[in-house]
């Protein structure tokens, strides 16, 4: 069964303290290419439940003929699978097989797309607006994006400085590919969104990861940044509000970072602002391009998925210097062409809801804040758990490392974020993403883009899961 092979991939890695291995077995919608070479110590010891264990030997039907060279390129083989996708798909397959799972892994709003936005897409279909558009995006949408950037962010762009893409992820990748050369360094504060490091590798660049501290709200220390910059430094990726931590960079800190960047002529900034509207007062959002002398150095990426609950519409955009945007457009023309005509019409309607999404988005943010407050208080009361209160987005990045080294009866040793996440999933049916996927193995990410009732049930399960572990560690 899919659910069996899915969890087996994770369980074997956790048992050995390794990242998820390659596999020819399917994990939901994800399929890896190398045969499983696993030691199923958890399964053999009887610690794992029967639904979790799967055979390590690939099916004969999946074995390729040795007479045909079906090898993959080194570029693809160097990439790591997204653990967010692995956990999300795994939880879904378990649910489909009849196992109830509380799913807190996916970074997807639980709200419906606003009705007026959905109607705009439906009307586009009814009116026959279903053909190719300009590669860069329809003029109406790019003009609306320019107005948004001017009114909300204080940034002046012309439509030819905007590139609409099939989601912000595509915008980010194209920006990295457009400005990075082999051997360049991409500076990435950790914890980071899972795709940043892999996108750098796709450009034959070297990701340079700078750890941050929970005691500093996971914010980049300017001194640490300065110590890592070299002549090879080409791109700094910043995400505020942050996925996975929810941290928001105050303007004063961004100004410090900008002063350091100004000393390095080759260094550009890729500012991921996809969670811009999901922010909790008194925190405020500052676009990096609005800082002194940073306009020409900054590539701003944003989109519609998070704020407007439009994840399935696949619509994002890049704003930046004209020649870089043109280069990204050239890439897009060879990769996907323009974004969906229907989604673009919906995007125009979304930007017409008012500043920061108007009352519609404000109601969503109000609900997210209520959920955040509940989780911070409820989980913060658990002994040994450390939390930095998020100021934006809809994630908690929780430090559970005090429980590493514990022994769980009927499970085994818990020595890292992967084994702890597996323990939560296998024994208590709560799906969360291990922190090592984001470059910080001390934590686990919880998405609170779900109902308060579900979160209350999750907290009770997490409490029960941690209770028996306390006896085996000094918490």
From Swiss-Prot:
GO terms for biological process: aromatic amino acid family biosynthetic process, prephenate pathway; embryo development ending in seed dormancy; L-phenylalanine biosynthetic process. Pathway: Amino-acid biosynthesis; L-phenylalanine biosynthesis; L-arogenate from prephenate (L-Asp route): step 1/1; Amino-acid biosynthesis; L-phenylalanine biosynthesis; L-arogenate from prephenate (L-Glu route): step 1/1. The modification N6-(pyridoxal phosphate)lysine is found at residue 306. It is an enzyme of class 2 (transferase). PROSITE patterns: AA_TRANSFER_CLASS_1 (PS00105). InterPro entries: Aminotransferase_I/II_large (IPR004839), AspAT/PAT-like (IPR050596), NHTrfase_class1_PyrdxlP-BS (IPR004838), PyrdxlP-dep_Trfase (IPR015424), PyrdxlP-dep_Trfase_major (IPR015421), PyrdxlP-dep_Trfase_small (IPR015422). One of its GO terms (molecular function) is glutamate-prephenate aminotransferase activity. Its EC number is 2.6.1.1, 2.6.1.78, 2.6.1.79. Its cofactor is pyridoxal 5'-phosphate. Prokaryotic-type aspartate aminotransferase. Also has a prenate transaminase activity. Involved in the aromatic amino acids biosynthesis pathway via the arogenate route. Required for the transamination of prephenate into arogenate. Required for early development of the embryo. Belongs to the class-I pyridoxal-phosphate-dependent aminotransferase family. This is Bifunctional aspartate aminotransferase and glutamate/aspartate-prephenate aminotransferase. It comes from Arabidopsis thaliana (Mouse-ear cress).
């Amino acid at each position: 069964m899919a659910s069996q092979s899915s969890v087996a991939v994770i369980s074997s890695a956790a048992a050995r303290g390794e990242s998820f291995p390659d596999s020819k077995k399917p994990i939901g919608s994800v399929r890896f290419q190398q045969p499983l070479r696993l030691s199923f110590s958890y399964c053999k010891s009887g610690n794992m439940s029967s639904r979790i264990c799967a055979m390590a030997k690939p099916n004969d039907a999946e074995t390729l003929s040795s007479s045909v060279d079906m090898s993959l390129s080194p570029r693809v083989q160097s990439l790591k699978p997204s653990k967010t996708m692995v956990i999300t798909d795994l939880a879904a397959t378990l649910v489909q097989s009849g196992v109830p799972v509380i799913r807190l892994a996916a970074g997807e709003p639980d709200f419906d797309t606003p009705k007026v936005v959905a109607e705009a897409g439906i009307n586009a279909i009814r009116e026959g607006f279903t053909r190719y558009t300009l590669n860069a995006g329809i003029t109406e949408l790019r003009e609306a994006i320019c107005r948004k950037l001017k009114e909300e962010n204080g940034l002046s762009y012309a439509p030819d400085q905007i590139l609409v893409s099939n989601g912000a992820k595509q915008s980010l990748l194209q920006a990295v590919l457009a400005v990075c050369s082999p051997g360049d360094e991409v500076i990435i504060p950790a914890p980071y969104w899972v795709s940043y490091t892999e996108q750098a590798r796709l450009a034959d660049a070297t990701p340079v990861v700078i750890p941050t501290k929970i005691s500093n709200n996971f914010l980049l220390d300017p001194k640490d940044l300065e110590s890592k910059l070299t002549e090879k430094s080409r791109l700094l990726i910043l995400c505020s509000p942050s996925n996975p931590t929810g941290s928001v960079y105050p303007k004063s800190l961004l100004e410090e970072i900008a002063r350091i960047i100004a000393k390095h002529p080759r260094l550009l900034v890729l500012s991921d602002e996809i969670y811009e509207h999901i922010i909790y007062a008194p925190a405020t959002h500052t676009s990096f391009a609005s800082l002194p002398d940073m306009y020409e150095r900054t590539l701003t990426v944003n989109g519609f998925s998070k704020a407007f609950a439009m994840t399935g519409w696949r619509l994002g955009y890049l704003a930046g210097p004209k020649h870089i945007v043109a280069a990204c457009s050239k890439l897009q023309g060879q990769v996907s062409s323009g974004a969906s005509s229907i989604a673009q019409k919906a995007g125009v309607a979304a930007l017409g809801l008012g500043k920061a999404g108007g009352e519609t988005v404000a109601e969503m943010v109000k609900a997210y804040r209520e959920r955040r407050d509940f989780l911070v208080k409820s989980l913060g009361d658990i002994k040994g758990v450390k939390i930095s209160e998020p100021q934006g987005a809809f994630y908690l990045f929780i430090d559970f490392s005090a429980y590493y080294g514990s022994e769980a009866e009927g499970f085994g040793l818990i020595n890292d974020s992967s084994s702890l996440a597996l323990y939560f999933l296998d024994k208590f049916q709560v799906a969360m993403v291990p922190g090592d996927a984001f470059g910080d193995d001390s934590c686990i990410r919880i998405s609170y883009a779900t109902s308060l009732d579900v979160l209350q049930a999750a907290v009770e399960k997490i409490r029960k899961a941690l209770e028996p572990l306390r006896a085996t560690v000094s918490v």
